[in-house]
């Protein structure tokens, strides 16, 4: 699958997402579950690592984990589950990462179920200038 400036804009169907996964553009700490691939999206999963931080941030020209070191209150092991405290800010590394080909960008939207439980979620990437947007050719980890 080739992407370029001539590729028409739009949302990728599940078949294209599956090609990206098979081609290594969406590697994961653990194998992807078949039900993660939706008709035009991919459900992402939390890793075992999270941080409670003083405030949300955009990393600017830095790596997310370098910025976390500046504002982290403590590290959280999610392997046994964890209850979020209301009014607190957390950042969690995702199991999936991206190695986007040229000509392809990505955008994240929270699942409606997170809003129903009053959780506000934004995606962060290394050197990201905007929440929820993944730049063309991005190669790196993802965080919520």
Residues covered by each model-derived region:
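Non-catalytic terminal segments and appended small domains
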Residues: 1-143
């Amino acid at each position: 699958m080739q992407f370029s400036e001539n590729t028409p804009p739009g949302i990728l169907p599940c078949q294209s997402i599956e090609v990206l996964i098979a081609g290594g553009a969406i590697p994961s700490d653990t194998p992807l579950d078949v039900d993660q691939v939706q008709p035009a999206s991919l459900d992402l999963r939390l890793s075992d690592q999270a941080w409670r931080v003083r405030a949300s941030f955009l990393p600017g020209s830095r790596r997310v984990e370098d910025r976390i070191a500046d504002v982290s209150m403590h590290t959280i092991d999610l392997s046994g589950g964890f209850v979020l405290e209301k009014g607190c800010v957390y950042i969690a590394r995702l199991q999936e990462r991206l190695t986007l080909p040229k000509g392809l960008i990505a955008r994240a939207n929270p699942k409606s179920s997170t809003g129903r439980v009053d959780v506000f979620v934004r995606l962060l990437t290394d050197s990201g200038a905007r929440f929820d947007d993944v730049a063309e050719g991005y190669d790196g980890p993802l965080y919520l």
